[in-house]
Amino acid sequence: DTYIAAENGIKSIKVKMSSTSEDMISSLNDLAGNYDGVDFISGAEVVGNQEMVRLFGDLGQTLAVPAEGDTEYTFPIGNFFTLLAFLPGEHTFTLTITDMQGNTKDGLLKLTVE
C-alpha cells in the first residue's frame, strides 16, 4: 500500500495507469465504460469517488476513499492485484497528489507480471 500525507489537507489524488498489456488496457477501458469517474487511462480521481468504492466492492474488496481536506490516506495498491494477476506485462501507476494549497507531487509505481 502507499501512504499519503498532506499537512495542508488533500484536495486531489489522481491515479493513472498504463501497461504494456493490450488486455490490461482493454480491461481498463471496460471499467471506464461501466463505472462513471473510474477512467484509469486518463486519470481517475480518488477523493470522494464512490464509483471507485462500488467497483472494488463488485470485485469483492473493500475500499475507502478520502474526503477533501483529509490529511492522510493509504492507497491500497494491492486491491489492483486481482486485475493484474492474469495479465502479464509492465503496469505503471502514476499517483498525482494535490493539497488544499495547490502543491502537487507525483509518484510512480511499476509492477511487472510474468
Feature names for model-found ranges:
Residues D1-E114:
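First exposed extracellular module after export/assembly in secreted or surface-exposed proteins
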